[in-house]
Amino acid sequence: MQYTQQAAAVTAEVNKAVQGKQQTVNTIWMAMLAGGHVLIEDIPGVGKTTLALAFARALDLKESRVQFTPDVLPSDLVGFSVYQKETGKFVYHAGAVMCNLFLGDEINRTSSRTQSALLEVMEEGTVTVDGVTRPVPAPFTVIATQNPIGAAGTQMLPQSQLDRFMVCAVMGYPDEEAELAILAGQSKGRLLDRVRPVAGQADLLAMQQEVSTVFVHELMYRYIVALAQASRKDPRLAVGLSPRATLALTSMTRAAAYLAGRDFVAPQDVTAVFDVVARHRLVLNDQARAGGETVDSVMQDLLRTVPRPRPEKADRHGR
């Protein structure tokens, strides 16, 4: 694993701008290494945007940011064509997603039509304007933030779009020491200005390639599928984990193993990332919600009741 030290340097650099959020930083970094997209859900003012911009700086990525409001149009994201009389041709003007890291702030404040414009980009890595399909630059990651449902001016993202985010991370308030560090650091200048590039686009692509080669034993595949099957049969859930979710869980476990310095996935990798992969995909039914159940309690039950493979069976030589 040639780039593991450089991968660790990225998180160290991002942590300069975001105090006390190591777990959230690791979650986003694993999703980027796995080639996925990230949804960050929390109240305003806890550092969601700063965190995304810190990754763009640490990785020297071309970033673009859109503050989603009801008047943002799909063409603002994917671009548009303009007819030029001089040449008699249509000229394409790139939209905001033509970048390496696209930050969509408060995605659940915009229209469903504009939200849907992200679907092709997130799933296919392309945009289609006037019948012409164009690839987005590689690497490409969407980091979207949303305020909790019920906040003024918000609307629920459709389940089809939620499922396209590999993970959903929650920031939460900083603890007392972290908040004091934020105040002390801010007095010496913007925390984001401390972040320096420690890798580039080519390095990220190389890391993603290394992550894709991390070995997954058949027993680990069976464990992941068993968790998904159990979620679909759980009487408390109206929606369980989709096949796309099992693919996301597998990719995230590879990234977790990679950051741990292993070339194979172990059972602890699955349990470490299960909540961030599953939380936004599982939907409680009305009866469970009325009974006080939570998605978190269901996830804990799934991890407790589905048998885990023995760790020694997980490597390349396991039987």
Feature-to-residue mapping (PLM):
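Walker A/P-loop
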Residues: 32-69
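C-terminal engagement/docking regions of AAA+ P-loop ATPases
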Residues: 233-319
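Conserved alpha-helical scaffold flanking the Walker A/P-loop in AAA+ ATPase domains
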Residues: 26-30, 83-104
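AAA+/P-loop NTPase substrate/partner-engagement loops
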Residues: 58-86
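Walker B catalytic acidic pair
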Residues: 42, 105-106, 117
